[in-house]
Regions:
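Transmembrane helix-loop-helix hairpins at the membrane interface
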Residues: 23-42, 46-202
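Interfacial transmembrane-helix boundary/kink motif in multi-pass membrane proteins
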Residues: 1-27
Protein backbone atom coordinates (compact mmCIF):
# COMPACT_ATOMS: atom_id res chain seq x y z
CA UNK A 1 0.00 0.00 0.00
CA UNK A 2 0.89 3.67 -0.07
CA UNK A 3 3.08 5.14 2.65
CA UNK A 4 0.03 7.06 3.91
CA UNK A 5 -1.97 3.83 4.18
CA UNK A 6 -2.85 3.27 7.86
CA UNK A 7 -1.94 -0.41 7.48
CA UNK A 8 1.58 0.51 6.36
CA UNK A 9 1.93 3.00 9.18
CA UNK A 10 0.75 0.42 11.69
CA UNK A 11 3.25 -2.12 10.35
CA UNK A 12 5.99 0.49 10.72
CA UNK A 13 4.97 1.26 14.31
CA UNK A 14 4.77 -2.42 15.16
CA UNK A 15 8.14 -3.01 13.54
CA UNK A 16 9.80 -0.42 15.75
CA UNK A 17 8.06 -1.78 18.86
CA UNK A 18 9.07 -5.34 17.99
CA UNK A 19 12.60 -4.07 17.49
CA UNK A 20 12.56 -2.67 21.03
CA UNK A 21 11.35 -6.04 22.33
CA UNK A 22 14.18 -7.77 20.46
CA UNK A 23 16.63 -5.28 21.94
CA UNK A 24 15.33 -6.06 25.42
CA UNK A 25 15.56 -9.81 24.84
CA UNK A 26 19.10 -9.48 23.49
CA UNK A 27 20.18 -7.23 26.37
CA UNK A 28 18.77 -9.58 29.02
CA UNK A 29 20.35 -12.64 27.39
CA UNK A 30 23.74 -10.94 26.96
CA UNK A 31 23.77 -9.71 30.56
CA UNK A 32 22.83 -13.17 31.83
CA UNK A 33 25.58 -14.80 29.76
CA UNK A 34 28.01 -12.08 30.82
CA UNK A 35 27.41 -12.94 34.46
CA UNK A 36 28.41 -16.47 33.55
CA UNK A 37 31.73 -15.32 32.12
CA UNK A 38 30.87 -14.76 28.45
CA UNK A 39 32.82 -12.14 26.49
CA UNK A 40 30.63 -9.39 25.05
CA UNK A 41 31.57 -7.59 21.83
CA UNK A 42 29.75 -5.29 19.43
CA UNK A 43 32.14 -3.95 16.81
CA UNK A 44 31.35 -4.53 13.11
CA UNK A 45 34.33 -5.88 11.19
CA UNK A 46 35.17 -7.26 7.79
CA UNK A 47 32.51 -7.04 5.10
CA UNK A 48 29.99 -5.41 7.42
CA UNK A 49 32.35 -2.51 8.10
CA UNK A 50 32.56 -1.54 4.42
CA UNK A 51 29.19 0.21 4.53
CA UNK A 52 30.28 2.37 7.48
CA UNK A 53 33.57 3.20 5.76
CA UNK A 54 31.96 4.05 2.40
CA UNK A 55 31.57 7.49 0.82
CA UNK A 56 27.93 7.56 2.00
CA UNK A 57 27.46 5.48 5.18
CA UNK A 58 23.83 6.57 5.47
CA UNK A 59 22.82 5.36 2.01
CA UNK A 60 25.06 2.29 2.14
CA UNK A 61 23.72 1.00 5.46
CA UNK A 62 20.10 1.74 4.53
CA UNK A 63 20.28 -0.17 1.25
CA UNK A 64 22.54 -3.00 2.38
CA UNK A 65 20.63 -3.86 5.53
CA UNK A 66 17.24 -3.50 3.87
CA UNK A 67 18.43 -6.20 1.49
CA UNK A 68 19.60 -8.34 4.44
CA UNK A 69 16.28 -7.90 6.28
CA UNK A 70 14.26 -8.81 3.19
CA UNK A 71 16.30 -11.89 2.33
CA UNK A 72 16.50 -13.25 5.87
CA UNK A 73 12.86 -12.68 6.78
CA UNK A 74 11.63 -14.06 3.46
CA UNK A 75 13.84 -17.12 3.94
CA UNK A 76 13.51 -17.89 7.63
CA UNK A 77 10.00 -16.68 8.35
CA UNK A 78 7.96 -16.26 5.14
CA UNK A 79 9.08 -19.45 3.38
CA UNK A 80 10.44 -21.74 6.11
CA UNK A 81 8.01 -20.64 8.82
CA UNK A 82 4.97 -20.79 6.56
CA UNK A 83 6.02 -24.17 5.13
CA UNK A 84 6.54 -25.66 8.60
CA UNK A 85 3.20 -24.32 9.79
CA UNK A 86 1.42 -25.86 6.81
CA UNK A 87 3.20 -29.21 7.24
CA UNK A 88 2.96 -29.58 11.02
CA UNK A 89 0.07 -27.34 12.00
CA UNK A 90 2.13 -26.30 15.04
CA UNK A 91 2.93 -22.63 15.46
CA UNK A 92 5.78 -23.28 17.89
CA UNK A 93 7.55 -25.45 15.30
CA UNK A 94 7.18 -22.69 12.68
CA UNK A 95 8.66 -20.22 15.17
CA UNK A 96 11.41 -22.20 16.90
CA UNK A 97 13.03 -24.26 14.12
CA UNK A 98 13.74 -21.33 11.75
CA UNK A 99 14.97 -19.34 14.76
CA UNK A 100 17.47 -22.07 15.69
CA UNK A 101 18.81 -22.17 12.14
CA UNK A 102 18.95 -18.36 12.13
CA UNK A 103 20.95 -18.36 15.37
CA UNK A 104 23.38 -21.04 14.19
CA UNK A 105 24.06 -19.35 10.84
CA UNK A 106 25.16 -16.19 12.67
CA UNK A 107 27.76 -17.88 14.88
CA UNK A 108 30.61 -16.93 12.55
CA UNK A 109 29.89 -13.22 13.10
CA UNK A 110 31.98 -13.03 16.26
CA UNK A 111 31.59 -9.26 16.59
CA UNK A 112 27.95 -9.77 17.54
CA UNK A 113 27.10 -10.29 21.20
CA UNK A 114 28.32 -12.47 22.70
CA UNK A 115 31.83 -12.87 21.29
CA UNK A 116 32.66 -16.00 23.29
CA UNK A 117 31.52 -18.72 23.68
CA UNK A 118 30.14 -19.21 20.19
CA UNK A 119 27.03 -20.98 21.44
CA UNK A 120 26.14 -17.90 23.48
CA UNK A 121 25.81 -15.93 20.25
CA UNK A 122 23.67 -18.70 18.77
CA UNK A 123 21.44 -18.67 21.85
CA UNK A 124 20.97 -14.89 21.85
CA UNK A 125 20.09 -14.74 18.16
CA UNK A 126 17.82 -17.78 18.41
CA UNK A 127 15.82 -15.95 21.07
CA UNK A 128 15.60 -12.88 18.83
CA UNK A 129 14.58 -15.12 15.94
CA UNK A 130 11.77 -16.53 18.08
CA UNK A 131 10.44 -13.01 18.65
CA UNK A 132 10.49 -12.34 14.91
CA UNK A 133 8.86 -15.71 14.20
CA UNK A 134 6.02 -14.96 16.62
CA UNK A 135 5.65 -11.44 15.22
CA UNK A 136 5.51 -12.76 11.65
CA UNK A 137 2.64 -15.10 12.47
CA UNK A 138 0.88 -12.40 14.49
CA UNK A 139 1.44 -9.24 12.43
CA UNK A 140 2.71 -10.29 9.00
CA UNK A 141 5.89 -9.93 6.96
CA UNK A 142 6.11 -6.14 6.61
CA UNK A 143 6.26 -5.46 10.35
CA UNK A 144 8.97 -8.10 10.80
CA UNK A 145 11.07 -6.86 7.87
CA UNK A 146 10.92 -3.31 9.24
CA UNK A 147 11.81 -4.60 12.71
CA UNK A 148 14.79 -6.55 11.38
CA UNK A 149 15.89 -3.53 9.34
CA UNK A 150 15.70 -1.31 12.42
CA UNK A 151 17.72 -3.77 14.50
CA UNK A 152 20.47 -4.12 11.90
CA UNK A 153 20.66 -0.38 11.34
CA UNK A 154 21.15 0.14 15.08
CA UNK A 155 23.72 -2.63 15.54
CA UNK A 156 25.83 -1.74 12.53
CA UNK A 157 25.62 2.03 13.04
CA UNK A 158 26.77 1.64 16.64
CA UNK A 159 30.31 2.93 15.93
CA UNK A 160 28.81 6.08 14.38
CA UNK A 161 26.32 6.51 17.23
CA UNK A 162 29.28 6.39 19.64
CA UNK A 163 31.34 8.92 17.66
CA UNK A 164 32.59 12.22 19.11
CA UNK A 165 31.29 14.22 16.13
CA UNK A 166 27.71 15.42 16.76
CA UNK A 167 26.98 15.54 13.02
CA UNK A 168 27.95 11.88 12.62
CA UNK A 169 25.86 10.90 15.65
CA UNK A 170 22.85 12.83 14.32
CA UNK A 171 23.17 11.27 10.86
CA UNK A 172 23.43 7.80 12.39
CA UNK A 173 20.41 8.36 14.64
CA UNK A 174 18.32 9.58 11.71
CA UNK A 175 19.45 6.55 9.71
CA UNK A 176 18.24 4.18 12.42
CA UNK A 177 14.92 6.06 12.54
CA UNK A 178 14.16 5.63 8.82
CA UNK A 179 11.98 2.49 9.26
CA UNK A 180 9.69 4.56 11.49
CA UNK A 181 8.97 7.10 8.71
CA UNK A 182 5.81 5.29 7.45
CA UNK A 183 4.38 5.39 10.98
CA UNK A 184 5.07 9.12 11.23
CA UNK A 185 3.64 9.84 7.77
CA UNK A 186 0.53 7.75 8.47
CA UNK A 187 -0.01 9.55 11.78
CA UNK A 188 0.28 12.96 10.09
CA UNK A 189 -2.07 11.87 7.27
CA UNK A 190 -4.60 10.61 9.83
CA UNK A 191 -4.40 13.92 11.67
CA UNK A 192 -5.00 15.85 8.45
CA UNK A 193 -7.99 13.67 7.58
CA UNK A 194 -9.50 14.21 11.02
CA UNK A 195 -8.94 17.96 10.78
CA UNK A 196 -10.62 18.10 7.37
CA UNK A 197 -13.53 16.06 8.69
CA UNK A 198 -14.10 18.54 11.51
CA UNK A 199 -14.05 21.48 9.10
CA UNK A 200 -16.55 19.93 6.67
CA UNK A 201 -20.03 21.28 7.51
CA UNK A 202 -22.84 18.71 7.73
CA UNK A 203 -25.17 18.52 4.74
CA UNK A 204 -28.49 20.25 5.33
CA UNK A 205 -31.52 18.07 4.83
CA UNK A 206 -34.00 19.25 2.19
Amino acid sequence: GKITDPAVGLASFRGVMIGLVCGGVMTFAVLALGLGGATVSLQPRGFFFYALNSASPVLSTLLFFLNVALLEELGYRFFAGTWLLERTGRRWVAIVLPAIVYGLTHTRLDFLPVAEPWWGRALVLTLVGCVWGWAFLRFGALAVVLSHWTADLFIFNWPRLAADDSMIVTAAALTVAVPAIPALVAAIAAGIRRARGRRTPPLESA
